[in-house]
Design a protein with these regions (language model features):
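Intrinsic low-complexity, intrinsically disordered or marginally ordered coil/linker segments
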Residues: 1-109
Length: 109
């Protein structure tokens, strides 16, 4: 069964610039496999789960990845352009209020 999960990855050529990868998958490593088929090898900087609310234009990130550990949010540098205009929040636990993430320096790809 698929679940809404995300990972943060970086290309070895730009190791300090992370990309937000998300989708409905069974395991976080399924996101990595699909992304690497197109973009080549990537270093993973953790991951978690997400709750996307299109009506409120929010993307709440929470939890951690069983495959890759807690998300290192300093690597949230590049986000798919279909999410531009969304407010991103992070909370360690589902159902808890989230903190708004600063996205002023994000590149929308």
């Amino acid at each position: 069964m698929s679940h809404p999960k995300f990972i943060l990855v970086s290309d070895p050529a730009a190791p300090l610039v992370g990309t937000f990868v998300y989708g409905l998958v069974d395991q976080h490593k399924d996101l990595l496999r699909a992304y690497e088929k197109v973009h080549g090898y990537q270093k993973v900087h953790g991951g978690g789960w997400y709750l996307k609310d299109d009506d409120r234009k929010t993307m709440t990130l929470y939890g951690s990845s069983g495959d890759y550990g807690e998300p290192r949010l300093a690597f949230l540098n590049r986000i798919p352009s279909e999410l531009e205009g969304y407010t991103f929040l992070f909370t360690p636990f589902y159902g808890m209020p989230g903190n708004v993430l600063e996205l002023d320096d994000v590149e929308w790809i």
